Amino acid sequence: MAPYRIVFIRHGESVYNEENRFCGWHDADLSGQGITEAKQAGQLLRQNHFTFDIAYTSVLKRAIKTLNFVLDELDLNWIPVTKTWRLNERMYGALQGLNKSETAAKHGEEQVKIWRRAYDIPPPPVDISDPRFPGNEPKYALLDSSCIPRTECLKDTVQRVLPFWFDTISASIKRREQVLIVAHGNSLRALIKYLDNTSDSDIVELNIPTGIPLVYELDANLKPTKHYYLADEATVAAAIARVANQGKKK
């Protein structure tokens, strides 16, 4: 076995996922299917004899609740949990709340794919007077206004997430703590891009399914030696296809 191991889980399906809407920093709840996925993720971890010493998640309820369901299945409700805005989903700007298929019909699938997946092209920003601007929410009241995005591309998300990896998560791993991260499609893509040294162009094609644990085994320098999902290939492929198809016209 590799010296270190970390487990990533994208939150279970949210109400906005179910409705095929851009979610971002909007605090959407889990759907019924999302609750089932979260519980199943915990069951998969238990069946494969995983345990954890510490967990990290975002400040968005779909990730927090997923983590809670997972820990409940593992009987690990007592372990320390750190919630941070740095693990939040990418902020989708003026796209937040819009239906992805309707947006693709209006602007074209290729433009929506660029907005969803391009590394360095953000969607149009929200105005600070817009109710969708996170700075209007109490949970960010103590956060410096310069840190609160009006929109983000994946490059921005990487720059937000990686300091938390270097300052906090990697230190936990090196202390030989068993670490669980429950976050979002794009904050996890940011971490995986760094770990796998994925190019800016290749990251466009990476899709992470909801609710399936992703295990990374790391060497002494925290470089990946192996990674795998705790599910069979057909299940993972079908789940990834569902994510990839979200930005297409119906």
UniProtKB/Swiss-Prot annotation:
Q: Where does (2R)-3-phosphoglycerate bind?
A: G24, E89, Y92, K100, R116, R117, N186
Which amino acid positions bind (2R)-2,3-bisphosphoglycerate, per UniProt?
R10, H11, N17, G24, R62, E89, Y92, K100, R116, R117, H184, G185, N186
The GO annotation for biological process reads:
canonical glycolysis; symbiont-mediated activation of host plasminogen
Task: Give the enzyme's EC designation.
Answer: 5.4.2.11
From the UniProt record, list the reaction(s) this protein catalyses: (2R)-2-phosphoglycerate = (2R)-3-phosphoglycerate
First and last residue of the signal peptide: none
Q: Where does the entry annotate site (Transition state stabilizer)?
A: H184
What's an example of a GO molecular-function annotation for this chain?
Answer: phosphoglycerate mutase activity
Knockout phenotype, as recorded, reads: RNAi-mediated knockdown results in significantly decreased enzyme activity on the outer surface of the worm. No effect on motility, morphology or viability during culturing for 7 days.
This protein's name: 2,3-bisphosphoglycerate-dependent phosphoglycerate mutase
